[in-house]
Amino acid sequence: MSQKDIEMELKELRNKLNRWSNEYYVLDTPSVEDSVYDKHYQRLLELEQANPDLVTADSPSQRVGGKVLSGFTKVSHDIPMLSLGDVFSKEELIEFLERLENSVEQKLDYSCELKIDGLAISLTYENGKFIKGSTRGNGVIGEDITENLKTIKAIPMELNEPVSIEVRGECYMPKKSFVELNTKREAEGQAVFANPRNAAAGSLRQLDTKITASRNLSTFIYYLMEPEKLGIKTQTEALNKLESWGFKVNNESKQVKTKEEIFAYIDKATDQRANLPYDIDGIVLKAESFAVQSQVGNTVKVPRWAIAYKFPPDEQETKVLDIEWTVGRTGVVTPTAVMEPVTLAGTTVARASLHNPDYLKEKDIRIGDTVKLHKAGDIIPEISEVVLAKRTEDSVEYQIPTECPECGAKLVHLDDEVALRCINPQCPALVKESLTHFASRNAMDIRGLGPRIIEQLYNREMIKDVAGIYSLTFEQLITLDKFKEKSANNLLTAIDNSRNNSIERLIFGLGIRHVGAKVARILAENYKSMDNLAKAKSDEISTIDSLGKIIGDSVEMYFADEHVMELLDELRQAGVNLEFLGKTREEQLESSTDSSFNGLRVVLTGTLDTLKRSEAKSWLEAHGAKVTGSVSKKTDLLIAGHDAGSKLTKAQELNVRVMNEAEFIQQMEEES
């Protein structure tokens, strides 16, 4: 490649990765799988390592990932808690060893340690007494979790010597404790944790320390900061000293001299992994000498003297029984592989998304094929490859459908998309998905009007579009399966309440392409009414901050449809509000800067007893919070009512602060 080509590829990679990172962490709308991001990130690292003079300040490689969540006091790390570089093969590991030894021009001894799958922590002691504990956070700023760490029996409150030190380690939940916790939660009707790491992370960030104490967490301490001040020269010596002071250290650590010893350690760890009482996801290799560690130093993101060898993902073989196609709300037709059930990473898996026709063609997946299945990110089932050696001779290439599986209309590609779409507005699947979206919690929030009820209403020709929801009668609803008087009355009340929503919910509920809840709010703030928005032109919309031409074109095209205008008239006649009722962001900021909720991203979930969900949302927004409908890594606070369900589970898995209704009401009263 020429220098110009390298510069162009680097620029493109940086732009893509920064955009994807923004979609994931800021907008809550990731557009690519983690595996796609990782592939591009690895390519970026390759090019930058070969061309260090082309590394820019805005490169993703110069950032330490992570986010400090609200709810705990922020703590600055005097010495950054850096992440480790990863390798995934012995060949890559050899390259690391050679690079490190060449940099110091000598053969080195190494410390091999198990990579505990938990949460990184830092502990500080003064004169032998524990005074502070914190999370890694973003590597530079973490959170003070001292009180919760005090509940963990493996952490000594006072050391065997009166030393003033900082140590780092991993907090984890033993496998046995994880099984016991999930068994108890399941028996109590609570959501279970996905894995021990998520359980440990969620337990460590509980506001109630009694809950943390009940979770039987443990720790391994693996590093002593500034060891030279104590005359300690090697990692093995430091581990021995840590143990003598009273810390729990992992006794599987081993000092080695050759790559053969390193590989033997990896092989042993791989064989013993399933039988260990705690989860590991690899091994960590460190230069044994602290003098060498100091000599080679760190990059912005990772130490040059250590590396993590990551185990390959758990993988199983299974057989593809069928390929099903489903139609989504926007008409996208998505293939899914139906497979013989297998156990993968502790759960039974029988289905895996095939994403789009291009993915299906690229993998050449056929009905009857034996495939290798793994969980991307240990969460999402994904077919990694077809086992061609087991493909039968009569196997035929799978034919991508040309007609919608629901209505038979011709499928099309729009704007060079890889996705196939059904664009028939009368497609039953599309209509039902649109109705479900319109009634969903983030849109018009019509409780009780879920997919099962919509299926019946549509099939019985009681509704054909969203306006039809507002014509439903008690006599119609009472005829539905398992629908009694109370259910019918509750649904009619929910429908009636939705008439009074501000238009940002309606805009989002209509399902305009490229218009999510955030964009809907921006449009509502700027245009104030549906009538104004319907007249807006793309060029005008495109000038609004954070929107642009794609959204502008989509909105203008949507309202250019005469059927849409007829629908708006029907909604108006049904008494649905078509005006913006909330405060603009500027008005909110003027009145909310002193609120503890100001600037927080908040999610409401479960049933609230004291006030309506819409009232809670309005109050939060008036006090500077941004209320979103889904939990992500960017969520600051989850307010949980009764029967909180999956959002509470996800919040605990992501270490998001959780507040119950009583705590929320108390805070409201203090700030009102």
UniProtKB/Swiss-Prot annotation:
The UniProt catalytic activity note for this protein reads: NAD(+) + (deoxyribonucleotide)n-3'-hydroxyl + 5'-phospho-(deoxyribonucleotide)m = (deoxyribonucleotide)n+m + AMP + beta-nicotinamide D-nucleotide
Q: What is its EC number?
A: 6.5.1.2
| EC main group | ligase
Which key words are in the record?
DNA damage, DNA repair, DNA replication, Ligase, Magnesium, Manganese, Metal-binding, NAD, Zinc
Q: Does the keyword Electron transport apply?
A: no
Q: Name one GO biological process term.
A: DNA repair
User: What does the entry list as the binding residues for NAD(+)?
Assistant: 34-38, 83-84, 113, 136, 170, 286, 310
One of the entry's Gene Ontology molecular-function terms is: metal ion binding
Give the cofactors, semicolon-separated. Mg(2+); Mn(2+)
According to the entry, every stretch annotated as the BRCT domain falls at 592-672
- Residues annotated as binding Zn(2+) are 404, 407, 422, 427
| Catalytic machinery residues | 115 (n6-amp-lysine intermediate)
Q: Which domain of life is it from?
A: Bacteria
Pfam families, per the entry: BRCT, DNA_ligase_aden, DNA_ligase_OB, DNA_ligase_ZBD, HHH_2
Question: Gene3D superfamilies under this entry?
Answer: 5' to 3' exonuclease, C-terminal subdomain, 6.20.10.30, BRCT domain, DNA ligase/mRNA capping enzyme, Helix hairpin bin, Nucleic acid-binding proteins
The job of this chain, per UniProt, is described as:
DNA ligase that catalyzes the formation of phosphodiester linkages between 5'-phosphoryl and 3'-hydroxyl groups in double-stranded DNA using NAD as a coenzyme and as the energy source for the reaction. It is essential for DNA replication and repair of damaged DNA.
Family stated for the protein in its record: Belongs to the NAD-dependent DNA ligase family. LigA subfamily.
Its name, as the record gives it, is DNA ligase
- From which organism does this entry originate? Ligilactobacillus salivarius (strain UCC118) (Lactobacillus salivarius)
